[in-house]
Amino acid sequence: MGLFGSFIAKFSKDRASSQDLETFKNLLIEADIGAAFADEVIDLVKKADLSELPELISKAITAKLSTKNRELKISSDRLTTILIVGVNGTGKTTTAAKLAAKLKNEGKKVMLAAADTFRAAAVDQLVTWGNRIDVPVIVGKPNGDPAAVSYEAAQRAIQESCDVLIIDTAGRLHTKSDLMDELTKVRRVVEKLTPIDEVIFVLDGTMGQNGITQAHTFAKATDLTGIVVTKLDGSTKGGIAISVERNLDIPIKFIGTGETISDLREFKSEEFISELLA
């Protein structure tokens, strides 16, 4: 049962007590929905006829979600370039591979670039994924310049008439200004050859408000066009999606729901709200 559904079912007949409301508020906050929005939901419950509660909560959630386009921007007449950014441990490299597999299955000619040059494990992981899904991976020298790898990949992708280039950038802490500057350099160098169409931030869905702080910092360093929320194995932690979009107004484009290559699904707000209210 979804985050709100269990509450609605329990109190569909009886008015919730103060203790019930406090318990529910704590559950909302633990689910990373954010304290401010939790207060709004509780206020709705206090004032509304419980029979109207599902519709009222649905409207409240919709008002918090971004209205920006959630579809990937894919060019029809030139190379589409996507930067995948985020900190280590969020599932960034796996997300790059999942997205490559998805686009390949849709008939696109895809290339991957391993620009996380300072982590041999990340390069090896992307190469392994590339072999598994039959997508070429451009690899540079160990500890080499990530911008150089990205530039070479863009050259190759153009030469080989690829539809999409996905660049897995170095995982970096949002507190390291030199690494954030490096991300800006990658973008600047690639854009000498081809536009950057998407910059997608990978957010660990279990990190709560700290993940939102990270996203804020990345958004200052480079214009983010979308977010992928990973490690969402069920709707019980789905509150983070509301909190992210409420704070950043950057659309969630995909959700990672597991470890397999197919566990990446498009974020559809109507389905998301239905799951929360189920």
Short names for language-model regions:
Residues 89, 117-119, 171, 207, ...:
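Short, glycine/acidic-enriched loop or turn micro-motifs at the edges of active sites
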Residues 13, 29-33, 46, 171, ...:
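Amphipathic alpha-helical interaction elements
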Residues 35-37, 119, 233, 261:
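Short hydrophobic/aromatic residue motifs in ordered secondary structure
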Residues 85, 170, 204:
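Short loop/turn motifs enriched for small/polar and acidic residues
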Residues 93-95, 117, 169, 175, ...:
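Ser/Thr-centric signal marking residues that sit
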